Amino acid sequence: MSASYQTIEHDVPQSYRDKILKWNGWGYSDSQFAINKDGHVTFTGDKYEISGKVMPHFRPWFENYLGIDLGFVSPAQKLSDVIIDAPVENEDIIEFLQENKISFSNEARIRLMRGHGHTVHDMINLREGKIPRLPDIVVWPKSEHEIVKIIEGAMSHNCAIIPIGGGTSVTNALDTPETEKRAVISMDMALLDKILWIDRENLTCRAQAGIVGQSLERQLNKKGFTCGHEPDSIEFSTLGGWVSTRASGMKKNKYGNIEDLVVHLNFVCPKGIIQKQCQVPRMSSGPDIHQIILGSEGTLGVVSEVTIKIFPIPEVKRFGSFVFPNFESGVNFFREVAIQRCQPASLRLMDNDQFVMGQALKVASDSWWADLKSSVSKMYITSWKGFKVDEICAATCVYEGNREEVDQHEERLNKLAEQFHGVVGGAENGQYGYRLTFAIAYLRDLGMNHGVLGESFETSVPWDKVLSLCRNVKELMKREAKAQGVTHPVLANCRVTQVYDAGACVYFYFGFNARGLKNGLEVYDRIETAARDEIIACGGSISHHHGVGKIRKQWMLTTNGAVGIALLKAIKSELDPANIFASANLIDIIGSPHCKL
């Protein structure tokens, strides 16, 4: 790495972000899908259940489905060859940080690691060594008091601030605006990572906002509790990040989304600290100020502490699965589950293409009995039940509770599935589906290594529009890809991941072989934009839980209306009149060079 400036720093912490995470890909440095010496796909490292396992069926599926050759490699640029521009100089803020003994650094790699999230643009730019505008200084507050001091310093010395938690954003929320002329401070919350107290009587927990999800859950488990919030990013995302993006976890059916779990929070903004004066389950005291902070995406200030609900660890956790003859049958089953309000902790439905992809990711078995059992199961489904291989879809679920509750819940869902021509697939298949949850995020890196551009995105949609939205968006992505010159088959599948009374959350996975395209990222952008337009046209939302960031701002006016946008701008103007928190997420500030609204 080359940087033509002097590094200045004070009391820099040893951060897991810098030590064990990839700088240009998802997750841990030692974990990735790779090709072994026998030409099969395997998973490296030791952090996941599929680590060290071979997936003999995945390579042929991947190559045939996307028209690629895994022997062709699109290498990423080495970190040592990446050139980082010098930061915007601001000696006053450096002196301020030194005087107040606040940990900081302007070292190139540290700035780089905090200057991006995980969109396909972020990753391709890093792989190609195209480094955009980065934050100029990274600070690590060790207390709420230091957060206040840093904001005061930014206001006094003409700086901007972009907070960062786990860095898992997929909305360009962490990208520094190219138009920002001030020195930009990245406020890394990593040192604010402690549980402050656990209240066993009221079943609440107070924690600092920088605590990583898996650490929070691990510490609670040792005390006999769970927070119940389990997003797919739980290994790396933080409590403060969950609040800032209005996050959702896969077990929301039992425990709720983050807005249901928050009891109290502290929020530091340029005008001071926002906090309610009591920690109660509900208040009727005017509009709920928590709802202003939830989903604010670092545009108004930074979350410092949060009180959340906690729950005793359930006595029983059991997996389940179902196979349906087609996607429509599965969706109708989900709708009936919602009507009868008998959702298990988690319930997911994969369409046929995603079901086939999941089968391709099955690891090689050492047991001939397991292989035989799998063959018999497939014969039962296809030959005896008459399910068509190119229409089958599957659902996986998690039951949690005491043994009696789980037994009754499982029996009820099994009977309900039969009414919609479903076949019980058993706990083992359900458990395998959830085992893949955290490892599957690494698939995109494998694709990029071989010329594939891909992304996932989500929406929420009313029940009466789920089927049409899924069908129309998938068809549009394939049609638009062909129109944009993509000559190979396109990956376009979906799953229903959350069940609500009035609708569902739908996740789309999209990817294509970009070899031979001169402008692969531009093609990708045009396809994704068309897909999001189609989602809106089909009655879906701008996002269910990923948030808006910068990449979805163009739909904010359509989503919230002119008066709604005016209200958001008024809140911004009141809490942050100097635009200190200048991430440019959600809305554009009137008078800024990039203002469109």
Curated annotation (Swiss-Prot):
EC top class named in words: transferase
Localisation per UniProt entry: Peroxisome
Active site location: 507
GO biological process, alphabetically ordered: ether lipid biosynthetic process; lipid biosynthetic process
Catalytic activity as recorded in UniProt: a long chain fatty alcohol + a 1-acylglycerone 3-phosphate = a 1-O-alkylglycerone 3-phosphate + a long-chain fatty acid + H(+)
A single GO cellular-component term on record: peroxisome
EC identifiers of the protein: 2.5.1.26
Main subcellular localisation: other
Residues involved in substrate binding: 444
Cofactor field: FAD
InterPro entries reported for this sequence: Alkyl-DHAP_Synthase, FAD-bd_oxidored_4_C, FAD-bd_PCMH, FAD-bd_PCMH-like_sf, FAD-bd_PCMH_sub1, FAD-bd_PCMH_sub2, FAD-linked_Oxase-like_C, Oxid_FAD_bind_N
Pathway membership, UniProt: Glycerolipid metabolism; ether lipid biosynthesis
Protein name: Alkyldihydroxyacetonephosphate synthase
